[in-house]
Amino acid sequence: SVIFKNYDNIDTIISLPKEHFKHIFKYLWGWIRLKQKRYDLVINTTGNSSSGKLSTKFANSKHKCFGDCNNDSVQNLKNKDHIHIAKCPVYALRNYLSKIGIDINKTKIPSLDIKLSNLEIAEGKKLLKELVYNDKKTICLFTYATGDKCYSETWWLELYEALTVKYTNYNIIEILPVENISKINFKAPTFYSKDIRQICSFIANTDIFVGADSGMMHLASASHTTTIGLFSITNTEVYQPYYNRNIGINTTNMNTNGIIEVIENVLSK
């Protein structure tokens, strides 16, 4: 997988097809490959996933962590953020290891990290320079999201206009989704790519990312650029970007001025 390209400790990825019955032989071969090896430790990183639980049971290992953050022992670790989808499996693993006599690691949970290389970051900088032609700091917008998570054009245009008034000393650019849709009617310079790592390297050279709850938001967080996630439907506490200055905003009780205040507070840190 391109996501784990620079992770030296990942050597084998078994990917089950989404449409099991259309690709039945590939699906069954995935399960056979899973069973062929014996593992020191098996971790289910998505506690609510039925296939995750099933594959954890199916795999050969003495030690299996099922990633359930709803049990009392995980909650008793007194980590108020244990419901976060990225932090939950880490807390669950720490809890499991403590049960088998291994001291719990109490360090801060690390950020998402796609591990961009220096070459990739340099390429991202070059792509940004081709778009803005100056040395100003850059605000990166992503105005799309799937389903009800997607804000209207009216909503985005109001925020965009407020940003252009407030941040005259910043570049404001927009990253486009694969669907090539802009909720601000292409008023800002746009960047389009289908290459996940190229997109991430581009974002890494901007100063702040603002976008709705989406895969692009998590990708921005993994680039280590300050990320502000906008939430109106999904649970902020479960999906918000975290670490450093990253923050999730519940927009159901905050207007455009409030969002600008949050952005200003983050940029001033």
Write out the residue ranges for each language-model feature.
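Catalytic machinery of carbohydrate-active enzymes
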Residues: S1-K269
